[in-house]
């Protein structure tokens, strides 16, 4: 678990994932391509694109193409993503969105997600959340979990 405290930044540059993500990958001794499932806080569509880029799942500036190419679709994409519907479709519980990210990641690792979206052989998952005011002052946390 890596938590990065608030820091001044410009929304044109990056999200807090640019700090918490690399630290989490280093501590877990894995890289973004090893992740089988990602549960990422999605308060707005731009938030998702920025965090996918800053976590290293795609190149900076290529988040839109990464998503539109179908990479986030469970069963067919390179990085199944927010299979619970995410905050934009299912579970935006005000300031408690981070925990829902961990819950769905654990369901995937245990093989307990809905059968239509269960990621086959999911043994490594990432949960990431950002809070505060994206683009000015915010904090982020990245958790990488492995099935035993």
Identify the role of each PLM range.
Residues 1-11:
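Single conserved hydrophobic/aromatic residue that forms the stacking wall/gate
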Residues 72-75:
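Membrane-interfacial loop-to-helix junctions in multi-pass transporters
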Residues 47-51, 82-148:
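Conserved beta-strand-centric core segments of catalytic alpha/beta enzyme folds
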Residues 34-54:
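Conserved beta-ketoacyl condensing-enzyme motif
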Residues 14-28, 104-111:
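Short, well-ordered amphipathic alpha-helical segments that serve as non-catalytic structural scaffolds
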Residues 5, 32-40, 61-69, 79-82, ...:
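Beta-strand segments within the central parallel beta-sheet cores of soluble alpha/beta enzyme folds
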